[in-house]
Amino acid sequence: MLNTYRVVPFDSKYGTIGPNHNGTTVHSLFQTFVMPAPVSSVPPHDDVYSLLRERIDLHAQLSDAVQIQRKLSGPRVLRCGDWQFAREVFAARFLSGDFTTFSQEGSRVLAVLGDIAGKGVAAGMWFTHLAGLLQSCGRPDFDPARMTSEINRHLCYLQPVAPFVTAFLAQIDCDLDTITYCNAGHFPPILLRADGRTELLEKGGPLLGALEGAEFQSGELMLEPGDTLVAYSDGILECRDTAGEEFGLDRLMASALEVKQPSAHATLMMLLATVQDFANGSPLSDDVSLTVIQRDAETTGL
């Protein structure tokens, strides 16, 4: 297949570069910017090539960093007994300041969703630090309030360098069908009962890294068959349509009830599709993350 490109001269501080004034064919977009026009002041070929090479290398390094971030987050979909877990993160820039993680040990699953202040590379680098803290603090005998307190103490020690972090930590016992959680300044996850009732999970404490010695409390609940828990970041709530209206918590709760599916992953994807339809092509202004935890509904034999 023959590809045809429309190319024009490009004005830079060095002068004009790009295709010749006499219509000489340029065979690739790369050549458009490395083939100088016959003008008195043009950048050397090596300078332009080096700049492009650096950008390509940076892109590759950022792509590697994204893969590392995904690897540290654990599986995107997980099953433990009759419990289902699904999570997704979409970065407004290459690296996300939002994070969602699953880690499993036997019949226990630690699920975390949080938001690191800022976006891009700096926030992504701090996630790797937090992942290490979660691994060291996330022992089965630690409840979420104790884990949260340890992480807060560490981030406060690193101030003023460390960012503020909001987080929701949930320790799930898939044998006892219980969730023990701590909400550290994060938007409260939504609990959708099978009968249509909804609750917000607010028990916990302040955001992490802001107040040394802050106290955190754990909440506990049982997830019955057919119940669903939806945790989310502010990027979901603050997603705007073309008129500038925010998606908001009320719309998220109504949508979660409306699109709920038999599987956690299907519920998650339907929710994301609802948010995407609402945005109607508007670009992301913030990172977006979503976690869905669901118990299988009871089935009755005929």
PLM regions with names:
Residues I17-N20, T25, L211, L221, ...:
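Compositionally biased, intrinsically disordered low-complexity regions
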Residues F33, V42-V230, S282-L302:
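… and, occasionally, acidic/histidine-rich disordered N-termini of signaling adaptors
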Residues P9, L29-T32, Q84, E215, ...:
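Intrinsic disorder/low-structure terminal segments
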Residues F168, M222-A231, I236-L302:
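C-terminal catalytic subdomain
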Residues M1-I56:
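Short, low-complexity N-terminal regulatory "tails/caps" that precede and couple sensory modules
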Residues G15, H21-G23, M125, E212, ...:
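Alpha-helical transmembrane segments and their juxtamembrane interfaces
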